[in-house]
Curated annotation (Swiss-Prot):
Function: Catalyzes the reversible phosphorylation of UMP to UDP.
GO molecular function: ATP binding; UMP kinase activity
Statement: the UniProt record of this protein carries the keyword Plastid: no
Subcellular location: Cytoplasm
Pathway of action: Pyrimidine metabolism; CTP biosynthesis via de novo pathway; UDP from UMP (UMPK route): step 1/1
Similarity comment: Belongs to the UMP kinase family.
Assembly, per entry: Homohexamer.
Entry keywords, A to Z: ATP-binding, Cytoplasm, Kinase, Nucleotide-binding, Pyrimidine biosynthesis, Transferase
EC nos: 2.7.4.22
Cytoplasm as UniProt keyword: yes
The encoding gene: pyrH
Protein name (Swiss-Prot/TrEMBL): Uridylate kinase
């Protein structure tokens, strides 16, 4: 029996690269879609916020001397490309994915309309939110916290390359241990980088828990959905 009925899955753009240095790795995205399909078949309503860092990162563009707002808009367009790739992979897996974008591009995707998104979720469709919040200076983590709050998700599932939040960087400190659960306040006091500060604060204020887990670990998403000991749960 799934532990959650409606979830917001945050996928980083980098996760779509697989072992490649850039772009979208088809086998990687197909594997992600198969994981998503499995939980959809359990009756879980799934919304996805996707990043664009595999194609372009607004922060990096700004740091290189580009106007930050322009760079962020370019990053939003990168998320649109990823969202369309994810939707296409879902079609091949016989799942109906609908892309809703915070930036209008009506010939390609639907605009973000909250009641429509909720209706599509209730119909068993996977809703993919593209273009972040539609505003520069806000990350796709913040978009995940915002959309998760708007659609009434029970939890934000932050899919990363590590299997949770650790006491220290496990790559640098072999003695680092994974937190099974941790409170928002404790994560702040220990300066643990779960999400960026704006996203983290929004989740805390809305009492929206976050589960950090590895998207690269086989069956991890299903284990999270079933309430098993996978990743790290950040709670109020």
């Amino acid at each position: 029996m799934p532990a959650y009925k409606r979830v917001l899955l945050k996928l980083s753009g980098e996760a779509l690269m697989g072992d490649d240095a850039f772009g979208i790795n088809r086998s990687t995205i197909e594997g992600m879609v198969n994981d998503i399909a499995e939980i959809v078949r359990l009756g879980v309503q799934v919304a996805v916020v996707i990043g664009g860092g595999n194609i372009f990162r607004g922060v990096a563009g700004g740091a290189a001397g580009m106007d930050r707002a322009t760079a962020d808009y370019m990053g939003m367009l990168a998320t649109m490309m990823n969202a369309l790739a994810l939707q296409d992979a879902m079609r091949h897996a016989n799942i109906e994915g609908r892309v809703q974008s915070a930036l209008r591009m009506d010939q390609v995707v639907e605009p973000y309309i909250r009641p429509r998104a909720i209706r599509q979720l209730e119909e068993g469709k996977v809703v993919i939110f593209a273009a972040g919040t539609g505003n520069p200076f806000f990350t796709t983590d913040t978009a995940a916290a915002l959309r998760g709050s708007e659609i009434g998700a029970e939890i934000v599932l932050k899919a990363t390359k590590v299997d949770g939040v650790y006491t220290a960087d496990p790559k640098k400190d072999p003695s680092a241990t994974r937190y099974t659960t941790i409170s928002f306040d404790e994560a702040i006091s220990r300066n643990l980088q779960v999400m960026d500060a704006t996203a983290f604060a929004l989740c805390r204020d809305q009492k929206l828990p976050i589960k950090v887990f590895s998207i690269q670990k086989p069956n991890a998403l299903k284990r999270v959905i079933m309430g098993e000991d996978e990743g790290t749960l950040v709670h109020v």
